[in-house]
């Protein structure tokens, strides 16, 4: 079996694909021959990434979508299949982890938003796309989880709980959609993306020396290797699992 990560003829849908980890994975797939559906709430940002992909010589469909809203998800899936006729790779990357000062100040609205984007949306996307993958030639689904799902902290309780649920969905969908569809998750550690610009970087870098084996945060491109492995033929016997890409987070 060839393990060269050639994705020519494949179609990938990446949520949260307009920046950060999503953009890095989308561009990497395009560079290896895949056509893309790029979606996030900000259509302008999706269009910018689509232009980058088209400059590589691949096709791209930018689509504005709030993945916490099922009616918008259904529109996204229909648009993707209308354009390409299939989806081979689904990457549930969109997420949100808003800050709060104490647990009692987490509102019902905030809690529901976190669960909607990190858990409810991926469930619906996996249901809709996975069913079509089973009816077609199969595929690979990759859920971007978080080390917060494995080592939850008081600063990210709703987020950690939602991502823990995503890990559970990863396992159950692997059985529900197998053997034609593989479903895996990547537990991402602290990556330096647009979101990290709000961090106290001096405090983070100091803390990283004792909490991360590599002593630093990750660059978006450093998640690409794991994503390509899970999406491609190299991961053909890997399903229902969570792979940590976290710099050795304690």
Residue map of PLM features:
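Conserved glycine-rich cofactor-binding loop
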Residues: 11, 18-20
């Amino acid at each position: 079996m060839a393990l060269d990560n050639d994705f020519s003829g494949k179609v990938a849908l990446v949520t949260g694909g307009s920046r950060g980890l999503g953009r890095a994975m989308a561009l990497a797939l395009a560079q290896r021959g895949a056509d893309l559906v790029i979606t996030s709430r900000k259509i302008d940002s999706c269009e910018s990434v689509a232009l980058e992909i088209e400059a590589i010589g691949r096709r791209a469909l930018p689509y504005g979508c709030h993945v916490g809203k099922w009616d918008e998800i259904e529109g996204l899936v229909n648009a993707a299949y209308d354009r390409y006729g299939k989806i081979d790779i689904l990457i549930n990357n969109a997420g949100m982890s808003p800050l709060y000062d104490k647990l009692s100040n987490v509102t019902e609205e905030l809690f529901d938003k976190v669960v909607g984007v990190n858990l409810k949306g991926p469930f619906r996307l996996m249901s809709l796309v996975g069913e079509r993958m089973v009816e077609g030639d199969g595929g690979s689904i990759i859920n971007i989880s978080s080390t917060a799902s494995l080592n939850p902290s008081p600063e990210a309780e709703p987020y950690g709980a939602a991502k823990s649920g995503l890990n559970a969905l990863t396992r159950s969908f692997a059985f529900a959609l197998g053997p034609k569809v593989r479903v895996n998750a990547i537990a991402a550690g602290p990556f330096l993306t647009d979101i990290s610009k709000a961090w106290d970087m001096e405090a983070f870098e100091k803390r990283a020396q004792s909490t991360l084996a590599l002593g630093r945060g990750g660059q978006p491109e450093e998640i690409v290797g794991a994503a390509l492995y899970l999406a491609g033929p190299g991961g053909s016997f890997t399903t229902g699992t969570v792979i940590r890409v976290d710099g050795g987070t304690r």
